[in-house]
Amino acid sequence: MADNVLRKLIVEICSARNLMPKDGQGTASAYAIVDFDGQRRRTKTKFRDLNPQWDEKLEFFVHDVATMGEEILEINLCNDKKTGKRSTFLGKVKIAGSAFASAGSETLVYYPLEKRSVFSQIKGEIGLKAYYVDENPPAAPAATEPKPEAAAATEEKPPEIAKAEDGKKETEAAKTEEKKEGDKKEEEKPKEEAKPDEKKPDAPPDTKAKKPDTAVAPPPPPAEVKNPPIPQKAETVKQNELGIKPENVNRQDLIGSDLELPSLTRDQNRGGGYDLVDRMPFLYIRVAKAKRAKNDGSNPVYAKLVIGTNGVKTRSQTGKDWDQVFAFEKESLNSTSLEVSVWSEEKIEKEDKTTTTTESCLGTVSFDLQEVPKRVPPDSPLAPQWYTLESEKSPGNDVMLAVWLGTQADEAFQEAWQSDSGGLIPETRSKVYLSPKLWYLRLTVIQTQDLQLGLGSEAKSKIPTTELYVKAQLGPQVFKTARTSIGPSASSSGSGNPTWNEDLVFVASEPFEPFLIVTVEDITNGQSIGQTKIHMGSVERRNDDRTEPKSRWFNLAGDEKKPYSGRIHVKVCLEGGYHVLDEAAHVTSDVRPSAKQLAKPPIGLLEVGIRGATNLLPVKTRDGTRGTTDAYVVAKYGPKWIRTRTILDRFNPRWNEQYTWDVYDPCTVLTIGVFDNGRYKRDESGKQGRDVRVGKIRVRLSTLDMNRIYLNSYTLTVILPSGAKKMGEVEIAVRFSCPSWLSIIQAYVTPMLPRMHYVRPLGPAQQDILRHTAMRIVTARLARSEPPLGQEVVQYMLDTDNHVWSMRRSKANWFRVITFLSRAATIARWIHGIRTWVHPPTTVLVHLLLVAIVLCPHLVLPTVFMYAFLILALRFRYRGRVKVNSVDPRLSCVDSVAPDELDEEFDGFPTTRQPEVVRIRYDRLRALAGRAQTLLGDVAAQGERVEALFNWRDPRATCIFVVFCLFASFLFYIVPFKVFLLGSGFYYIRHPRFRDDMPSVPVNFFRRLPSMSDQIL
């Protein structure tokens, strides 16, 4: 954005719905107060209306265009105090600056009103539009030349008289302006409902402070402002008035409320944050340019840097301007001196027309590394200086360079030649990637008309009906509607109008594909009747289900002989109210809707320090003699992917890089993977290798304490066809910062996904297909970056193969179910022990507890919840304080899996194994499915016995049950309910002496009821 562009934010307050009554008479008199970047505007009051309609536009100036996305627009809906004595707060809405649309692309969005505190009674929603307009500033008016008479008079007057007259004119102008403003206020006073506690606007600055030499014309009258800013009282800006209490945290820059949240995402706080990692000292050398005594600019020149056995040179250039930065890791240096030399290359052509290059040294300058200055940001960069090159053959040459000791936090580090990552190799540099913005594209196929099927007379007699379907294609995605049939008479006359009313949902990524191709095809002859292309730029967008997209007619074009084949009636829209899932639902890291107008402001900040790895195993060989690992780390949270630099040929690499993400939901997962870089080198044919997975960990943010640093080493385990293998450990530091407890509580009580997922849900099978489609789109888009993020890396991070059958995963899920049911089994064993009087004192206490529950039933719920409170409070001390749970190898059953099961897990679709191996696996799967089949039959039989009891399938059993119900009704009518509960309880826990080992009467009766098992073939 150019600096000379003025930006205005337009907030159009349209209407509100279903507000909370506040005046005691079932109505409310609502008005809206809008705050943005220190500016406040107010709408008119709509008296006694729970569905007010304003349609007012409020304008705000954007002071800093670059940081507009970090500002917060807050709308507070209030009830007029004059109409009621109750609370005036009706709700609030906060919109992040990144959700503002440009002029022309704005849409009406209804935001649900949020509570100010937990105890607020708020309901309803407010509809508004927020967009910005860029304007060019008006040209500065040219200074008018004073008239000659006025100028001469001014020159003739003494300085004292001139100053006095100037001051008099300014005083009169100020009085005139104040009078006009006063008249204007008197006119506007009866129109507006001014608050008694409002302050007057600040007075204009004293014009006497500036005394121009020439006469000043009276200022023009002030321009009328449609929405004047509302002065704020000191009490209104307090945080307790807004229901938000700031929470003190460890870091000084994290103190504040959610109104101060944009300060967490400022660049100055992000750029200077390296408190989660260790400072790595680097020796920086900036080689700017060289100057020769003999002005010979024809020969290329380069500089050579030597530190012990480490040497590197700049690129060879004729202009002698390099401006290159070199960063040497201090721990790897084996010398205390730096030698910089400048060399000249000269090409000599021999008699046989061959060219040879000779190099000549122009001079050398040395530095003692113990005397190199240190620089720590935010210090300014060290200015390069001219140094004279010492040379006996070519004296008088100079080189401009700067040498300093810094850390990885230095601004020059990212673009510098780095000694630990192989220099200036693009594939080994740290990068940040962004996933493409994904949308759901909904195509509703309604019907077709005037189809020109073109069947001959012979075809009509052979084919009684014609089956049609509609195929839609967006890029590589192809979806088809169901088949529909039309009769031969309709097909012959061309009057067939088949109707579908079916939705086809695609995944579209920005920038969109140019066209959506819709084709009507005939199944009977396998030919296309006609097709049309819908331009994606003409597709409208909707954010909720309150507005339906407009239906449109498109002509179907056939081949050259039939330019018109009919027309098709469809609805097309981009669904902005959904979140497009591109990862598994249980490890999702982002749940925001596609439309940025619906996005909420971030609630916190996630900071991740990738420190290093230890004891990595070699994954490849170098020079055919020794193993090596070139490791780097990829972290994903939300649409942001980060990739650290690759540390070459080290088993204990240290990255010490820190990154930040905005957090919009605490119940999300951070995914971190370690890989071996195989792409920075090419083979003999020029093809890049593949990156090898080393391990992966996940950190769920909801398990982290806020504003606390977690520094742990996580085991890296990878599943190979030969079995599970421990590849090493990675050291990660994580901190989740959130300045407001209220934002966290609101996040826990709101739905996980946007509203459209619940009002118009997608089917499980359809959502699974769309998720894998989104994964493929993200993988393909990141693979086209430069340098690319490999397909194997993205697939491993997104878990694209989690739907594939795996015996290991099936066992892991089965053991999870068993672990959960084991707690219920423990309770059942405890109750059985009480029934059988294993511990008589406990059974006696249960008798007393049963009597207390029956006699005082109102104490049951308080006792249960108090017991739960005490249990959870006592377990607080045993929570995981230090270690954050990540991938659990034991829970994943990686140690108890057979080699054949692992080989089956790595087998693709279709299988590539031998038929004998496939037969064995199929027989094993049949055995497991047989057990599941028997279990399902037993469960179904229990439900069928209950249905048989009420359907008189066994007349005698149902008759017995009917007689029992009759006597039971008389018994329960006569016997008090408390007596029945005591009797039933005492009978259930009676002493074993009064028990029988045989099954009870109800169990015998239920097992004799018939089921449908005997009717299954």
From Swiss-Prot:
Aminoacyl-tRNA synthetase in keyword set: no
Pro residues bias spans: 217-231
Domain C2: 1-110, 258-387, 420-554, 587-714
Residue positions binding Ca(2+) 2: D296, D352, T355, E359
Protein name: Multiple C2 domain and transmembrane region protein 14
InterPro entries in alphabetical order: C2_dom (IPR000008), C2_domain_sf (IPR035892), C2B_MCTP_PRT_plant (IPR047257), C2C_MCTP_PRT_plant (IPR047258), C2D_MCTP_PRT_plant (IPR047255), MCTP_C (IPR013583), QUIRKY-like (IPR047259)
Membrane topology classification: Multi-pass membrane protein
One GO MF term attached to the UniProt entry: metal ion binding
Locations listed in the record: Membrane; Vesicle; Golgi apparatus membrane
SMART domains to which the protein is assigned, alphabetical: C2
Disulphide-bridged cysteine pairs: none
Biased composition (Basic and acidic residues): 154-213
Swiss-Prot/TrEMBL cofactor(s): Ca(2+)
Tissue: Expressed in incipient leaf primordia and in roots meristems. Observed in flowers.
Region ranges (Disordered): 139-231
Function: May function as a signaling molecule by regulating the trafficking of other regulators.
Domain of life of the source: Eukaryota
Keyword annotations of the record: Calcium, Golgi apparatus, Membrane, Metal-binding, Repeat, Transmembrane, Transmembrane helix
GO CC terms of this entry: Golgi membrane; vesicle
